[in-house]
From Swiss-Prot:
Name of this protein: Arginine decarboxylase proenzyme
Subunit comment: Heterooctamer of four alpha and four beta chains arranged as a tetramer of alpha/beta heterodimers.
Swiss-Prot/TrEMBL cofactor(s): pyruvate
Cofactor binding remark: Binds 1 pyruvoyl group covalently per subunit.
GO cellular component annotations of the record: cytosol
Pfam families, per the entry: AdoMet_dc
Keywords in alphabetical order: Autocatalytic cleavage, Decarboxylase, Lyase, Polyamine biosynthesis, Pyruvate, Schiff base, Zymogen
Species in which this protein is naturally found: Sulfolobus acidocaldarius (strain ATCC 33909 / DSM 639 / JCM 8929 / NBRC 15157 / NCIMB 11770)
Record has Lyase as a keyword: yes
Post-translational modification, as annotated: Is synthesized initially as an inactive proenzyme. Formation of the active enzyme involves a self-maturation process in which the active site pyruvoyl group is generated from an internal serine residue via an autocatalytic post-translational modification. Two non-identical subunits are generated from the proenzyme in this reaction, and the pyruvate is formed at the N-terminus of the alpha chain, which is derived from the carboxyl end of the proenzyme.
Length: 130
């Protein structure tokens, strides 16, 4: 009697698939960076584009020398966080998902295309379980 050996590679259902796209956006129109409603709308649309499921979205405006806006979307798959500093014309963007079918890069690229920074950096991290 012969035995067959099967591959023990875990399927996506047997592990967490963590996809993390994050980066820095430089030299953005400071009027965009202070428009809380616009920024919240961009994050909401990015949730849809990335095929994520929104749980809640919150946003805050901060004054002072390092003032700006923070928008955080809690999604079933994880989160999108956008933080701006208008005086520096700078923003950071973090899109993390554990959803197999979600696309954090699409969300990142959508927000970047709408904020139109003169320069940006995008990084990827695989945060999947083993």
């Amino acid at each position: 009697m012969s035995q067959q050996l099967s591959s023990q590679t875990p399927s996506n259902q047997d592990r967490i698939v963590g996809k993390h796209v994050f980066g820095n956006l430089y030299d953005i129109d400071d009027k965009l960076l202070m428009d809380k409603d616009l920024l919240e709308g961009l994050v909401l649309e990015a949730v849809k584009i990335a095929k994520m499921n929104l749980v809640e979205i919150k946003s805050w405006s901060f004054g002072g020398k390092k003032g700006g806006v923070s928008v955080i979307a809690l999604v079933e798959e994880s989160h999108i966080a956008l933080h701006t500093w208008n005086e520096y014309k700078y923003a950071t963007l973090d899109v993390y998902t554990c959803g197999v079918d979600s696309n954090p890069q699409a969300a990142f690229e959508f927000i970047v295309s709408n904020l139109k920074p003169k320069r940006h950096q995008m990084f990827f991290a695989d945060r999947s379980s083993e």
